[in-house]
Amino acid sequence: MTDNLFNRTELLLGSEAMERIRSKRVIIFGLGGVGSWCAECLVREGIEHLTLVDSDVVCVTNCNRQLMATTKTIGQPKVEALRTRLLEINPQADIIALQKNYSEETASDFSIETYDYVIDAIDSLKDKISLIIRTLSNSPLKGENQRSATEVEANSLPLREGWGGSFFSSMGAALRIDPTKVRVSEFWKVKGDPLAAAMRSAMRKHKMFPARKFLCVHSEEQPLPNLGTALQDGSQTFNKTRTNGSLAHITAIFGMTLAGLVIQDINKQS
């Protein structure tokens, strides 16, 4: 039954690319409105080795935008609810569910070097920066190797030996409604996104910069205001500075664009 699951993918990309897709290892941090759609798209296109990372459980307020969130999955760990769905698509896939949060304290729990692709769909500013810093082999440069933020923005820091995989990140998808404004840009060139601006400001303040450039999915639409009162959004609500409104068609575009970046990159290798 599963022999022809990816026939249409192979028709477009070819058998060599299909084999590469099957062999790649991907890890997604954050399974909200962006990460959950990214995961499904990757599995539907042939990724067979996928690790899902999120500490939260499905909440009723997730149902408007998160793929695995239904009235039947409320209260279930997000990683388990999504894993169940993905295995219904491809029962032979190797889907690892890790119900934990990525942070400075837990960073050593993840063997990033074993993955070909790392997808950042984290909401928390601090944890997001930590993932970028650690994955892209950052440390403060001292002495003659120290560079200014301006130089980093222009050229990025030199690539150091170490992890050779690819890193893709999602900027803010909340408070947007226009699907035609979604873009892909190098991190230091993202404009009009408050999250990216806050991340760059924090990196400059602490003199911690990515060792190489990476692509982000973002929106050029100016964030709209919240008009209502936010209800509790899972166990992570009170770790956020605030809870913003968001829509499935935007978060799904972000997630699927991240998946598209992975598939494009694999296809180029063929």
Model-derived features: positions:
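Hydrophobic/small residue at the entry helix of a nucleotide-binding pocket
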Residues: V34
